Curated annotation (Swiss-Prot):
Keyword line: Amino-acid biosynthesis, Arginine biosynthesis, Cytoplasm, Lyase
Protein name: Argininosuccinate lyase
Disulfide-bonded cysteines: none
Family statement drawn from the similarity comment of this UniProt entry: Belongs to the lyase 1 family. Argininosuccinate lyase subfamily.
Region of interest called Disordered, as start-end residue ranges on this chain: 440-459
UniProt key word Protein biosynthesis: no
Entry GO terms, CC: cytosol
Phylogenetic classification of the source organism: Archaea, Methanobacteriati, Methanobacteriota, Thermococci, Thermococcales
EC number(s) stated in the UniProt entry for this protein: 4.3.2.1
Organism: Pyrococcus furiosus (strain ATCC 43587 / DSM 3638 / JCM 8422 / Vc1)
Pfam families associated with the record: Lyase_1 (PF00206)
Subcellular location(s) of the protein: Cytoplasm
GO MF annotations in UniProt: argininosuccinate lyase activity
Amino acid sequence: MYRKALLGSTRLDILSYISSMEEDREIVEEVIECLIAHVKGLIHSKLIPEEEGEKILKALEELRASKEALFSIEAEDIHEAIEIYLKEKLGKTGGYLPLGRSRNDHVVCALRLKAKKALVEEIGLILELRKALIKKAEENVYTLMPLFTHLQPAQPSTFAHYLSAIIEELEDITKILFSGLGIVDKSSLGAGAIGGTSVLLDRGYMGGILFSDIITNSLYATSSRTFLLYSCFLSVLISIALSRIAEDFVIFSTPNFGYIKLPNEHLSTSSMMPQKKNPVTMEVARAWAGEAIGHLVAMMSILKALPSGYNLDMQEVNKHAFALFSGTIKTLKIFVDAMKRVEVNKENMKKDCDIFPILATDYAEKIAMNTGRPYREVYMEVASIIGEHESTEKIYSELSSKYGISISLEEGIKKPVVGSPNPEDVLEFLEKAKKNVEKDEKKLEELRQNENRDNVYNP
């Protein structure tokens, strides 16, 4: 359609090579929303006859319910397909639509809407995950477990303390996601192809239908994908955090550890070995983080060193962004379900606390403080005693005999510093965590209410 007057038709194989129609399935809803805002802006500024504008709005609203019809049209992209559709449906009236509009400002508008919706959904799912973690932590404040460095038993803790670390990380990620929305939630409508338009559009009015602000500079509005890279980076950040939890859960669910039992729906068996219970959802989540990083690297590789202004290279970025949003949201849903229903084996956790000399640091610190001797000197003595014995019981027995002190696991977790596994500290943290969830839920609800703007045509 666009090329006909200047270039004539092209071959189908070439059209297929440059077309983004399949990828545009992901943003067809957002493209229509942007067009509705644009037409409302044209009517508002009295740039087209109101009656004709209302016909276009009605047709666009009807198109929302029958979007699949667009994908039988031969077109470079969804924007061209919609214009072809409107021309066939409305005749000349459809020709009012593109006044003051370019695909360049409209694809950015659609991508920003898509990214905004993805961030909002990610925040909502992270809030669900935080609530599930808090509930599970409250049930396990006194559930002893070893913590690990280098995957070696390190110090005594509780399962609640372990989960609290995840909760606090997700709180920080939530803050970053809210911050990201401030960057994404801006309108490009009215920026034209690159240098604006001579049509006197009210950019603030159009932008206010879908966004909370506008991008001022028309070149930046149409040719930058920083907003998309940033929102995709946030999806990668989430995915990496989840992959580390997934790795822990894969390890903790093995018979060798036996700390947790994942829901049966999250497990798969072997085609040959009837005893196998494989933690497949966690394995896929672990792999997804690698894929997510790959998508982000592909996006950055495409965008780096592009000249200013729109280039069709940018079209190739979109499929990676869509995959990132979709994959991260799916993975979050898996974790919400798994965390709600995971079972904890307190006996196995406690058993490993007894088997390994994870109180060694507590002994060394207490001896140093009791005697006033340099810690490194005491550390060396404790390490030597550990090296002489295979049995944890014998290690503790000699330390107690030699230095006249005895430390239990329960004492070992009751450390005086803030943020330790001390049950009092953990309970206090969990109370704050619940309040933080409530604050973030309120913030998200306010954001969703603000998004419930009248961007739907009501004849």
